[in-house]
Amino acid sequence: MPEMGVFLLATQAMAAPGELLNLALNAGAIAPEGAVLVAMLATLLVDLAGEQAAARWVPPICYAGLGTALVLLAQQWNAPLEPSFLGAFLADNLAIAFRAVVALSTLLSLLISWRYAEQSGTPIGEYAAILLAATLGAMLLCGSTDLVSVFVSLETLSVASYLLAGYMKRDARSSEAALKYLLVGSAAAAVFLYGASLLYGLSGTTSLQAIGIALLTSPTPLAALSLVFVLATVAFKIAAVPFHQWTPDVYEGSPTPVVAFLSVGSKAAGFALALRLLVGCFGAFDNQWKLLFTVLAVLSMTLGNVVALAQTSMKRMLAYSSIGQAGFVMIGLVCGTEDGFAAMVLYMAAYLFMNLGAFACIILFSIRTGSDRISDYAGLYQKDPLITLGLSLCLLSLGGIPPMLGFFGKIYLFFAGWADHQYLLVVVGLVTSVVSIYYYISVIKMMVVKEPKEASDVVKSYPSIQWSTIGMPPLRIALVGCVVVTAVGGILSNPLFQWANNAVAGTPLLQEAIALGSQRSIG
């Protein structure tokens, strides 16, 4: 019947736009972020039912959301690449790897948070919701391929981080940390917006790939100026010198579980942003931004590890240590080779476990003593062998002592740097690694070598462990898990390195940059 044929054609014509829109959106790419979002909304709803309901249901909701996100990320691994949301997001292997680091850092941060929140009287529903919001922003930032999505994701992460830093409202140091973080972060956001506006004006598009092509065909002085603004924002997010001033104060004043997340999750998102922007947009200025990052890496490794020697607070010491660690990761970024990018991804995964393991020990010590001073750890081995062993292994790994996981992470970075003729970075990295070993071992020596009569007053009155207390079992799971991976992961580092290699091989952006770099070196 002619009428039926006309009807079918009309139906197909009406369905076609919807199908095209579905293909253009490809919403399945952000299914892991959807799981985190659902967990965040459920946490807020449960929190409305009262503190008792929140204490009972918020932890399992968070575990379910983050666990689901990790499973969905595993399913996306090596999947066919399709741009999402009209080209604003891409779930390539690089994005999946960094999103997994962010999600896992949040999961471990939550495990070490519950006892801390219970003892300090912090409402866990609001705290968990804000932390999940920061996680959502960080995960979206790892896969953003458009200036608009980059800015929205960046601000989602930043605003949630400001709230987390000042969450202990009655603590003057927490409020001070939040204010400093807000002021410096707002300035960084303004600088990024100015750089992004220059890029849009020069290219007429917000797509990072299209911007990179436009700058390759017609590089201009204004493009170089935009590079400076964008690089300043990236350096702020990864706490590179000289954009590091906020780090020690924020780390010292913020709640310790928040610091644990910022030191890993936020930093991982920052390095993912660096790869998307610098490698993706500024291929025309490859030599220039690599030179600038070489300077930042040298300054970060030197200042971070040298100033850490003089610290008396554990959190401030780890703050300067994290600045130095960022310098090590930048070696892989400057190399721009397949080995360099893979070593960068591997070291971020290793840093996740060894740094969060150290923070788990610090939290366990602080909730039992209320102290953060390094001198108060004197003689701790006599009263708490678990914290002593766990903190010692994590600090040795951060220092790069074999056969810990951190040693193999640094070896891969230094090998990639040497192969790419980055001799200055490798030499500075080796020297500053030796410096870092000194202050890490100083803490270990204080805990282990001190005689009982030389123990600090805090350790002498150290309370016995009650593992059945609310929030203690998850803390023990996180601590033991991180310490085991840190200690054993070095011996079994080959699968991790294979995973990092696959992350680079499954990312067209990095493969194009590697090929372009090879052509330039041959030419």
Curated annotation (Swiss-Prot):
Enzyme class: translocase
Record GO biological process: ATP synthesis coupled electron transport; photosynthesis, light reaction
Record text on subunit structure and interactions: NDH-1 can be composed of about 15 different subunits; different subcomplexes with different compositions have been identified which probably have different functions.
TM stretches of this protein: 29-49, 57-77, 94-114, 123-143, 147-167, 182-202, 221-243, 255-275, 291-311, 317-337, 345-365, 389-409, 424-444, 477-497
Summary of the function given for this chain in its UniProt record: NDH-1 shuttles electrons from an unknown electron donor, via FMN and iron-sulfur (Fe-S) centers, to quinones in the respiratory and/or the photosynthetic chain. The immediate electron acceptor for the enzyme in this species is believed to be plastoquinone. Couples the redox reaction to proton translocation, and thus conserves the redox energy in a proton gradient. Cyanobacterial NDH-1 also plays a role in inorganic carbon-concentration.
A GO term, aspect molecular function: NADH dehydrogenase (ubiquinone) activity
Pfam families: Proton_antipo_M
An annotated GO cellular component: plasma membrane-derived thylakoid membrane
Catalytic reactions of this protein: a plastoquinone + NADH + (n+1) H(+)(in) = a plastoquinol + NAD(+) + n H(+)(out); a plastoquinone + NADPH + (n+1) H(+)(in) = a plastoquinol + NADP(+) + n H(+)(out)
Record localization: Cellular thylakoid membrane
Membrane topology: Multi-pass membrane protein
Residue stretches in coiled coil: none
Record bears the keyword Transmembrane helix: yes
Highest taxon of the lineage: Bacteria
EC number: 7.1.1.-
Name of the protein in its database record: NAD(P)H-quinone oxidoreductase subunit 2
Keywords, alphabetical: Membrane, NAD, NADP, Plastoquinone, Quinone, Thylakoid, Translocase, Transmembrane, Transmembrane helix, Transport
